[in-house]
Amino acid sequence: MAAAVAVAAASRRQSCYLCDLPRMPWAMIWDFTEPVCRGCVNYEGADRVEFVIETARQLKRAHGCFPEGRSPTGAQPAAAKPPPLSAKDLLLQPPPQLGHAGAEAARAQAMERYPLAPDRAPRLASDFSTRAGAGLPQSAAQQSAPANGILVPNGFSKLEEPPELNRQSPNPRRAHAVPPTLVPLVNGSAALGLSGRAAATLAAVSGTPGLGAQPAELGTHKRPASVSSAAAEHEAREPSKEKAQPAHRSPADSLSSAAGASELSAEGAGKGRAPGEQDWASRPKTVRDTLLALHQHGHSGPFESKFKKEPALTAAGRLLGFEANGANGSKAVARTARKRKPSPEPEGEVGPPKINGETQPWLSTSTEGLKIPITPTSSFVSPPPPTASPHSNRTTPPEAAQNGQSPMAALILVADNAGGSHASKDATQVHSTTRRNSSSPPSPSSMNQRRLGPREVGGQATGSTGGLEPVHPASLPDSSLAASAPLCCTLCHERLEDTHFVQCPSVPSHKFCFPCSRQSIKQQGASGEVYCPSGEKCPLVGSNVPWAFMQGEIATILAGDVKVKKERDS
């Protein structure tokens, strides 16, 4: 019952000739040579719709948008005569088969969606029952292709959907019911029509039947990578047809004319395989073009030997493999690069480049493909820290990831270290990490203060105030600061929370808990200038002016002393 209602509702809809969408009768306009919807008329303009309809009709005729079985069915007018077939159509027209009388009639008639007759019969789901769910055999699928080689992806409909919704809709989710030979050649050559004419001409000259040329043309044009594996296997089974029809290849596909392709074929033949059975031959067009370009630009030998012998070298050289296990995978790359020296460089320069005397294995030294200039990489390496510390190793991004440092923290670190002496203006902005919510991440400005302090102070004697923890280099993030030594208040020596304390922007070892900070502010007088809670007037970085708390910071610190009375539950 529901299916009958759906079919009845679908039968009332009419497809627009221009936009090809199913419309209700009240949305259609019948004042022109073809039924068009109001949306197309409004978009094109009533004065131009007829011209657009004629243009669309010519395009549909030229590109063969309606293969067999897709034209409207029903009573055909007696006056509608089939158009004269060209020589190309005669060559490529298959012999009639049993059970395909309807298909022959559909092919013979004009490729119009709607005959210019008053009796337009609705197309129901039963019209497609002969071709719906069953996958056609190879020969029938090839015969249903139009003459000029352009294939329609959804030549089949699904019975569970309203039939009017199946009219030439470019919906990709219906492609699974289509044989792989009917998938549109998206990445194929741009001159499909020309190649089809070349096939017809070649068939006419050589005397071969037209149907013999059409499967070869289908196999010659490479399909995109999204086509199922059955299509790739089908191509691999037709190497002889590819070699027999060289005229079908477009200029973009002519690998055989290049010297690199002949070398590839010779190399494959030396391994005991036919040239047409090479791996590169069954790849999509974009992959083949890329491989050929790499082969032409790499002068160290045939590219296939590089791919087969040293996959790690090519992967790291051309793609800059930024692996998660940093040093492990890159050491293997360095070993292969050291084994094979294609250029007469001294032995010491073959390995990974050294920066600041340390080996950087994450920079590849492959000499083919993508070369890395060593001079720009100096901008990624920060100067060594001025303070000696057990944590003074400079971590480059892969190694820092092993140490638990996030890539964003590494980027911030590189930007800070490359900046030089720009911290003086930052130091006047925020002087403490006075956040009430300890679970929130530290603000960037406070992180900069805690990170910039030790680098800029450098040689200052920070032990004068009895600093209880060593000065950490700027390369370590806040998490490693907290993990290396417990944070203690400089005054009361109590354990500090990771993010909930007051940090002196000048002296890194000056860290104060909130009770000590409140007491210091009250002692100094909150109305005037309030300096470092240590009692010293710590100068700003790069100047002799002592820093002082801003009023907002004083209010934040003192706000923790106020206890809010809870309301009684009423």
From Swiss-Prot:
One of its GO terms (molecular function) is transcription corepressor activity. Keywords: Acetylation, Activator, Cytoplasm, Isopeptide bond, Metal-binding, Nucleus, Phosphoprotein, Repressor, Transcription, Transcription regulation, Ubl conjugation, Zinc, Zinc-finger. Its main location: cytoplasm. Residues 66-85, 130-179, 213-283, 330-403, 419-477 are annotated as: Disordered. There is a cross-link at K271, K285, K306, K308, K331 (Glycyl lysine isopeptide (Lys-Gly) (interchain with G-Cter in SUMO2)). Coiled coil: none annotated. The modification Phosphoserine is found at S71, S169, S226, S250, S300, S343, S389, S406, S438, S440, S443. Residues 232-245, 274-283 have a biased composition (Basic and acidic residues). A zinc finger (RING-type) spans 489-536. Belongs to the IRF2BP family. The C-terminal RING-type zinc finger domain is sufficient for interaction with IRF2. Interacts with IRF2. Part of a corepressor complex containing IRF2 and IRF2BP1. Interacts with VGLL4. This is Interferon regulatory factor 2-binding protein 2. It comes from Mus musculus. The gene is Irf2bp2.
